[in-house]
Amino acid sequence: MSIAILLAAGKGTRMRSGLPKPIVPFMGKPIVAHIIESFKEAGIQDITLIIGHGAEEVKETIGSEVNYVYQNEQKGTAHAVKQVPETSALLNSNVFVFVGDSPLITADTIKKLESHHVKTNASCTFLTAQFPILLSYARVIRNDSGELIACIEEKNATLEQLKVRELLTSHFIFKGEDLFKNLDDIKPDKGNGELYLTDIIGIMLAKNLKVEAVQIDDYKELVGLNTPEDLQWSEAATRSRV
């Protein structure tokens, strides 16, 4: 059994819209609705949205097809996940944690991630892609044998690490028990005090828990939309698929 948590509490100031970011229209539907549809198409029916800014407006727009958890203060992606109650269903399931602003993600990619996670019996599996454009995402660091050794947020990366084009964009699946067991080990960022979920990768690797990365071909599936220009770019990418 798998459960999905979508991080949708952001305000989306750069969108320059009067709407909360998750419900900004994209190709005729709210951004987060595309992600919900992809999960349902992949057979994942138990979906929780973590909401914050404009929470009631988001609930009214998306409706009762998903569950809701409030993040009253936005203190990072790991902090958002910590707002979800640790139910036995969560602890005994595989738990997707996806950002709620990447509407090009497909059901096939979701199924591919889940299949690899189950097949390898990993504690954590996440999506990556080779990005031909420079974006401010975490770098996936591997050793000379190609083994995953770390994921480094862009602002903490060295000049050499910044050259890495394999990027991580916060599309995870976890064993539920391992996710919640390790969340409390994440320390606040020294710069802004936020709790980053990407830090759980290093924590798990240090404990010799199995962490897997699944690289997909189309990096555009992983791109988060933050500005009106991003919306235009993503709509053009969607039309080119048809």
Regions from the PLM with identified roles:
Residues P25, L104, I173, G224-L225:
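Short aromatic/basic micro-patch
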Residues G18-H34:
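Short catalytic helix/loop segments, enriched in acidic residues and glycine
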Residues I105-G191, I200, L209, V214-I216:
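Conserved core of the sugar-phosphate nucleotidyltransferase
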